[in-house]
């Protein structure tokens, strides 16, 4: 059963109501692995989404568990149910920067056919989903730093889905915003480095 809702703000030209669905009704779990794969080893961070593990660690810390790593394909999604200050109820991202990636088997991975994966990740990182997860996961329910939430529990949340054209438009907009943020962050870091160098040379 589904309900429909209309968002308070949206792009001009879209008038249809958004459909409320259970996440589990529109996604399919992914558990595939390939011990022989040479795909990059990646992980999810709350700030930046998918990054290569080598960007965070100087060595491969997967060890023997690497054989169990899930092989994710471009356009598929993963939910990292590790709590962080930025995202206390975990974070979900679509793989967009590589054709394939090997990712920790503790992540909940899934495909969302007929949906825009980037749009899905935007919604699944939103405040409404966090509120729903708060009711599912006790703040004390932790195991090895992970929120104790199963795939079925995670996909029991409700999502609001517009048509695919509107999903594409929203995903494009937020991708552009993210690119602008990254660009300005790099410019800021560059200016901070210049300032530091000038201060060091002026006051010697």
Question: Model-predicted segments: where are they?
Answer:
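Long, compositionally biased tandem-repeat segments
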Residues: 11, 18-22, 174-180, 191-192
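Sequence-specific dsDNA recognition surfaces
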Residues: 24-34, 45-77
């Amino acid at each position: 059963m589904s309900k429909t809702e209309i968002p308070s703000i949206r792009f001009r030209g879209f008038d249809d109501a958004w459909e409320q669905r259970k996440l589990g009704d529109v996604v399919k779990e992914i558990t595939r692995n390939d011990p022989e794969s040479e795909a990059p080893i990646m992980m999810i961070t709350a700030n930046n989404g998918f990054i290569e593990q080598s960007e965070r660690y100087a060595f491969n810390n997967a060890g023997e568990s690497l054989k169990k790593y899930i092989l994710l394909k471009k356009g598929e999604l993963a939910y990292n149910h590790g709590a962080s200050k930025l995202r206390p109820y975990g974070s979900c991202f679509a793989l967009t920067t590589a054709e394939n990636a090997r990712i920790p088997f503790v992540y909940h991975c899934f495909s969302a056919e007929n949906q825009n994966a980037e749009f899905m990740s935007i919604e699944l990182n939103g405040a409404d989903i966090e509120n729903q997860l708060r009711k599912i996961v006790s703040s004390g329910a932790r195991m090895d730093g992970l929120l104790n939430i199963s795939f079925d529990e995670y996909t029991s949340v409700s999502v609001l889905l517009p048509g695919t054209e509107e999903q594409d438009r929203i995903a494009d907009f937020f991708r552009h915003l993210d690119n602008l943020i990254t660009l300005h962050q790099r410019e800021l870091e560059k200016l901070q480095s210049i300032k530091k160098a000038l201060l060091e040379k002026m006051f010697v």
